[in-house]
């Protein structure tokens, strides 16, 4: 939840309990954020976060450091055709920011059931947001159950998009530009493979 002062932060943490994740609103790369395990750390991070935020706002939530971090790259066109281009796993999980994490494709520690469950949710999320082009959907996943959270949806090309393109041979930037201009996935060919359309989901037999 969003708070604008240290007093509001302390009141919220009394409800949530420690540890908590604190993020400064409208910053990049985790600037001004951190994990608070006690009131001293809470004071320090909240004051710093509010100072770094363009809106003098910090977001506080339950810390999920032991949870897995899973990503899906999704491509969707104006006709509603939607494919999963790549599935990735942040090896160090939620405790390390995705920009500093080690990422592997495809995911190595989730079950087939978990893979398909999160894939379906990623496609539903892209559809609900009416994404036209490419997007990245990130999840936290409890390693001891199938509980999950949607962390964020990036409706743009990102660091993950570059990795996904390299790992799969699916030219995300080129095809996303074509889709945004009105082309549909079935009528676009993957110029890297030369034989598949953009509707073809890459399948990796390597890491």
Predicted regions and their residues:
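A conserved helix-loop-beta module that forms one wall/lid of the active-site cleft
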Residues: 1-33
């Amino acid at each position: 939840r969003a708070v604008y002062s240290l007093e509001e932060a302390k009141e919220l943490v009394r409800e949530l309990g420690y540890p908590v994740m604190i993020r400064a609103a409208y910053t990049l790369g985790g600037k001004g954020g951190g994990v608070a395990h006690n009131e001293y750390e809470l004071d320090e991070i909240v004051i710093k976060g509010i100072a770094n935020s363009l809106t003098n706002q910090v977001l506080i939530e339950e810390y999920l450091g032991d949870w897995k971090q899973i990503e899906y790259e999704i491509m969707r066109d104006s006709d509603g055709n939607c494919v999963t281009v790549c599935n990735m796993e942040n090896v160090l999980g939620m405790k390390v920011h995705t920009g500093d994490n080690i990422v592997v494709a495809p995911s190595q520690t989730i079950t087939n059931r978990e893979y398909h469950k999160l894939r379906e949710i990623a496609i539903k999320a892209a559809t609900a947001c009416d994404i036209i082009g490419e997007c990245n959907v990130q999840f936290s996943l409890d390693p001891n159950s199938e509980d999950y959270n949607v962390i964020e949806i990036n409706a743009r090309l990102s660091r993950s998009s570059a990795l996904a393109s390299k790992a799969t041979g699916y030219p995300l930037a080129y095809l996303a530009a074509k889709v945004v201009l009105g082309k549909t996935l079935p009528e676009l060919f993957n110029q890297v493979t030369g034989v598949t359309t953009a509707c073809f989901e890459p399948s990796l037999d390597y890491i």
